[in-house]
Amino acid sequence: MSETAPVPQPASVAPEKPAATKKTRKPAKAAVPRKKPAGPSVSELIVQAVSSSKERSGVSLAALKKSLAAAGYDVEKNNSRIKLGLKSLVNKGTLVQTKGTGAAGSFKLNKKAESKASTTKVTVKAKASGAAKKPKKTAGAAAKKTVKTPKKPKKPAVSKKTSSKSPKKPKVVKAKKVAKSPAKAKAVKPKAAKVKVTKPKTPAKPKKAAPKKK
């Protein structure tokens, strides 16, 4: 039996690696500014709570916290803020401390501060109404602009009138020139040159001599 030679196997080709895609760096996000909490600040809430109370001796810290909690303010988390707000209001002169020292005590609204608070409320309302009215003006101005824009395409009509009138002028001028030119040619007649004819003078005939008498 004839031995069959083993068939050589082709060298294993290594699979091509796909080109590594470059990682695109994402742009760093800009630091988002912290949003201020919507609504009045702690000091404003304290002033409102003290002004609403009818106690002549002043509002205690416990009573103030109750009124703030009823308004929906988180008293437990913002306990330190309430104390700082009370101290700052006392230092500014908006609140007067009738009893105790520091944050622990009773507080009453200063009469001068009451007049200032009323004026600030009026100015805030006026600013809010002015800000609300401004967008109406801009909307009206935008409407006027949109109305005025379609009037511009009417201008080409004037150019059509001028173009229709312009060809009439050369026709009139040409007609006049053609009418005048033959008249001039007829009026001018060439003058014939006058030639003077000199007549030849005939010689004088000799007179016959008279016969002499015998």
From Swiss-Prot:
Entry PTM: H1 histones are progressively phosphorylated during the cell cycle, becoming maximally phosphorylated during late G2 phase and M phase, and being dephosphorylated sharply thereafter. Citrullination at Arg-56 (H1R54ci) by PADI4 takes place within the DNA-binding site of H1 and results in its displacement from chromatin and global chromatin decondensation, thereby promoting pluripotency and stem cell maintenance.
Query: Sorted alphabetically, which CDD domains does this protein's record hold?
Result: H15
PTM Citrulline: list the residues. Answer: 56
**Phosphoserine carried by residues:** 2, 12, 43, 67, 106
Q: Does the keyword Repeat apply?
A: no
The H15 domain is annotated at 38-111
In this UniProt entry, the residues modified to N-acetylserine are: 2
- Post-translational modification Phosphothreonine, affected residues: 202
- Low complexity composition-biased segments: 116-144
The task this protein performs is described as: H1 histones bind to linker DNA between nucleosomes forming the macromolecular structure known as the chromatin fiber. H1 histones are necessary for the condensation of nucleosome chains into higher-order structured fibers. Also acts as a regulator of individual gene transcription through chromatin remodeling.
Protein name as it appears in the record: Histone H1.1
Which organism's genome codes for this protein?
Rattus norvegicus
